[in-house]
Amino acid sequence: MFDIRKGVNLGGWMSQCDYSRDRLDNFITEKDFEVIASWGADHVRLPVDYDVILNKDMSLKDEGFDRIVRAVSLAEKNGLKLVIDLHKTVGYSFDFDVDEAGFFENEKYQEIFYKIWEKFAQLFGSKPDTVFFELLNEVTDKEFIDPWNRIWQECVKRIRAIAPVTPILVGSYYNNAVSTVRFLEKPDDENIIYNFHCYEPFAFTHQGAGWVPEDVLPRDRRVSFNESGATVEYFEGLFEDAINKAKEDGKLLYCGEYGVIDIASPEDTLSWYKVINEVFEKHGIGRSCWSYKQMDFGISDDRMDKVRDELIKYL
């Protein structure tokens, strides 16, 4: 069922945006699905913030779910599978600039989370070969891993009552770091996939990023690909623990996000994609690059025109 290899994120469409009708109607259109399919991709990852699918009173918003149904239809029309990623839930966001807190302690927030996924299961549980569920984007702090292991396993239990075989993706803490996959509890479910994100070496992929604290990464620091240390050997070492954990537990690995900020040169970005792709391919790791359009990482942006035809070979 879960046989995807080459994907593209639709970041900024139903997440990390102003949620205006114009944004939701026009940021991504059918033409974009056609373009992604023409690149040889086999799936898209759709980040969704709860703001799109919940009303202010926390009831389910039919209009928002209808938008996701349409996105699935557009993907299927173009021969693409789709990962639904809950990018932000009530009481939690990976983004430190967003005022959300309490999810890991608050049972009310957790029940809303379960309710969202039960709805997704009702809508798409009959499509286990084409629609996959990613429960939550980028758990941040180490202190959250114990409650998160409990929460995601309860969520899987509730989904399974409705969608018994849909592949479900689960990531660990430090923003889905590949180094923390080993802290996920082994599930008694053959259709759980271990999920991670990879923006390493961070000083290269996030150079100049305005949202990264200055004491973590000086904003004026620039790092070329040749200076970055990004080699096949580097990524082999970085992924080793996660690969071993997945083998031990009989699970597949998936990289839900990876990419390079648009401050790096297109040529350096291409070089990075070539190297990480070699390791993905060697170990059979499915992946979805960040991101299709804008969001500081867009591979369809004009600046990438000269290298895009080559880059898409290495998605």
Mark where each language-model region is.
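Active-site mouth of glycoside hydrolases
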Residues: 1-167, 172-180, 191, 296, ...
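Active-site region of glycoside hydrolase catalytic domains
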Residues: 4, 105-232, 236-261, 275-278, ...
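Active-site donor-binding loop signature of nucleotide-sugar glycosyltransferases
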Residues: 10, 196-198, 292
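Aromatic-rich peripheral "rim/lid" segments of glycoside hydrolase catalytic domains that contact
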Residues: 265-315
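An exposure/low-complexity boundary signal
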Residues: 59, 68, 249-269
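Generic, ordered loop/turn and secondary-structure boundary motif
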Residues: 14, 185, 200, 298-300
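Short, hinge-like loop/turn segments at secondary-structure boundaries
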Residues: 63, 100-103, 185-188, 211-213, ...
